[in-house]
Amino acid sequence: MKTFKEFLEESSLSRIKSKSDKGGMAVISGSRGDKSKKENKARAKQLDRDIKGKGLPGATKVSGRWDEKDDDTGKTTKVKERSHVVTSGKKGKRAFKKAVKSLGKKYGQDAVLTQTKKTGTVSATRKGGLGKQAGKNVKRFTAGTMKPGRSSAEGDTQIKKKTFAYKK
């Protein structure tokens, strides 16, 4: 049986890194920049329930930063939000990605980050979520590999004051 301290240590950067190395993990958030703090907190709780409802193991809560684009003005703002790191559990790659993308769509997210094997992929969950390139909507792009201890201009994730980002 684990002690309480051992239980608390489980949700650390090294644990997330080991799950990342095994493959089959995703980062998703229920927060939106246009919602109040209270609404975002309620959405994060509901997202936690929805993750378990999709048959995925419980998520590790982290703090994330992301550039969010306003649909009306087209203005980009840096948003700090509560994110969830989810592993695939017993789900296959396709079913896992599908479940995570559907959750991203439900919560109106621009995109979700999924990782199978070594590289992470950022997939749009709504039209125009990742902007346009050469006049066409971007559906997905490769984020690179997980780099613990680094931060990125596009966005990064933090757990217990330790940061990680995806870089090529």
Predicted ranges, named:
Residues 53-94:
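Short, intrinsically disordered low-complexity segments
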Residues 73-81, 122-152, 167-168:
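Short, low-order "capping/linker" segments at domain edges
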Residues 22-25, 80-83, 108-111:
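Short, surface-exposed beta-edge/turn micro-motifs
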Residues 29-35, 88-91, 115-120:
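Short, flexible beta-strand-to-coil junctions
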Residues 94-119:
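Short, compact, well-ordered microdomains
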Residues 2-58, 159-168:
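N-terminal, charge-rich interaction modules
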Residues 36-51, 98-105, 125-129:
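Surface-exposed flexible segments
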